[in-house]
C-alpha cells in the first residue's frame, strides 16, 4: 500500500518557529499513466513553444509548472533549544519517519529529540542520553550515521534509536539511543559517505569515498563486513521497489537523473546501472542553484523528487552571467529560494501489443513549485 501523505517540516522565516504540515501525496499524480503521459507531452509542447517565442534566448523556468499554493495549516509547532541563551542561534538538524508516514522524529542542534504522531496529534519528548547502552531491542529501529566521519569522534558516529511500532502514538516505552560499532572506514580522514540503503530487513549497505568501497552492516549481529572495492551509483540514499526488484536513487554522476540497479545480483561485483532520466521539470535554467535534492519513496513504484533551489538571476556578486550574450536573462528572475516537488512512477515493460520497452520505464506526473517567502520548507519526509 502506498503512502497517503507527504510530511513537510516548515520554518517561519520571521519567528524561527518550525511546524509540521502535510499534503496529500496524490496531489503530485494524475489518475493514470496515460493521463500523465498526455500531460507530459502537452508540457513539452508548451516548453518548446516558449523557447521558440523567445528565439531560444529564454528558459521557461516556472512557467510550465503548477503552483503548490498555500501550505496546509500546521499540525504541530515547535522550536529548537536556544544555543547559549541566544534565540537566533538555533536550528533543527534532523527529521525522519519512524516506521510509517504518521510518526516523525525531529532533532535539534543540541541533540534534543521529539516524536510527533500525526494521527493522534500527540508529541513525545525524548531527551534521554544518546549514549545509552543495553540489549533491549524493540520491533523497529532507526539507524543514524554521520555522513562525514571524524576519526576523533568515531565512537559516536553511528547510533540506533530503538522504539516500538505497534502503537499509533508514543505512549509506550520511551525510545532510547544506543551507540554502535563504527564502520571500518571511520579511521580515514576523508571517509565521506556517498550512498546508503537498506537491502533487507537486517542489512544496511554503505559506500564511502575513502577508500572507494561498499560495506554491509548486519543489524542482528551488529557486525560490519566489506563487500568490495566498488561504490553504489547513488547520491545519498537509495530506495527498494519490490514490484520491480530494483533499488532506485539519484545518480551520483547525473544529479538530476534517477538510476536503478540490482544490488543483490552479485555483491562482489559493481551493480549494473540503468539510467532513468527525468524530463522538462529538471531542464533547469542556469540561474537556478540547487542546494538540496532528495528522493522520497511513496510505495508502489511511486516517488517524489524534492528539489530546493536558490535563484541567482541577476546576482553579479555570485558570478552569474547570461551565456547567451544578449540582454535577455535565461529565465524570468525569481527572488530568493523555492522548492519543486515532482511525482514520478516507475513501471515495468508492458510486454503486449508490441510495446515492450525492454526495461523499466519512468512516467513523469506533476511538478509543483512553492516560493519561499514567509515560510521555508526545510524537509520533506
Task: Tell me the role of every PLM-derived stretch.
Residues 1-381:
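Beta-propeller domains
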